[in-house]
């Protein structure tokens, strides 16, 4: 780890001791990349406080969701109210879109229907079955692409956040700490709201479970999904794989969750259904309501 990354990590831990590990890593990565992209030669943490105006100008081109996270990281690190004020403006803008049930420009440009999502899944399933029956053409990368679409599209199970599956293990796991698959069930200890909801489990439908079991026999690693260097997948890697699976569209996990909930809650069903699905997707009922778009 570089000296700057180490200092960022320690300072954020000091300022937010209860911040989850995933959020900590995200904040450090964002802050380090802003510093790198702006080509600063000043490697002191004070740089983030001394150059507020220039940094705000640099990051303003990000989409609202990314900008909100970036500003949150900057505020947690520095405590500068300028970052917080802009962050609150962005959050208000995002919430207004949700209230009006409108899509952002990026979402509108890349939005696809639930039926189109299912078409992609079934095309992926057909290709995976073909690879299994013809071992000579088997590609681990393509099979991982199929599994990711199955896990995250909503065509098979309610779609959780990408890193819930990036952390998913199939062997040598600690059942009290790790996310893991066992005997047709998914167990989640690591996810964004784990401190609130604790361990969550999800049953895997039998047909998809069969595909998982066949994959585990071929998988040489401890993780359900892995990169070309046999390490667990990162969020950016998962995003790139999804973009490929959906024909080059900018389809993120967040958008797939929006598409799924927009379909499920099209006519706003009973709150009990909202509560149940929110739990299965690893977030709060309030956030589920915010996701609804038409």
For the regions a language model picked out, list residue spans one by one:
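A short, glycine-centered helix-capping/turn motif at helix boundaries
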Residues: 145, 150-173, 267-271, 281-282
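Flexible interdomain linker/hinge and immediately adjacent N-terminus
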Residues: 85-133
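Basic, Lys/Arg- and aromatic-enriched nucleic-acid-binding interface segment
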Residues: 119-162
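C-terminal catalytic core of tyrosine-transesterase DNA break-rejoin enzymes
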Residues: 255-284
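Conserved tyrosine-mediated DNA breakage-rejoining catalytic core shared by Y-recombinases
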Residues: 163-206
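Active-site/catalytic core of tyrosine-dependent DNA strand-transfer enzymes
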Residues: 203-260, 265
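Non-catalytic DNA-binding core/recognition domains of DNA-processing enzymes
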Residues: 13-95, 255-258, 282
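Residues within the helices of the helix-turn-helix
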Residues: 22, 163, 275
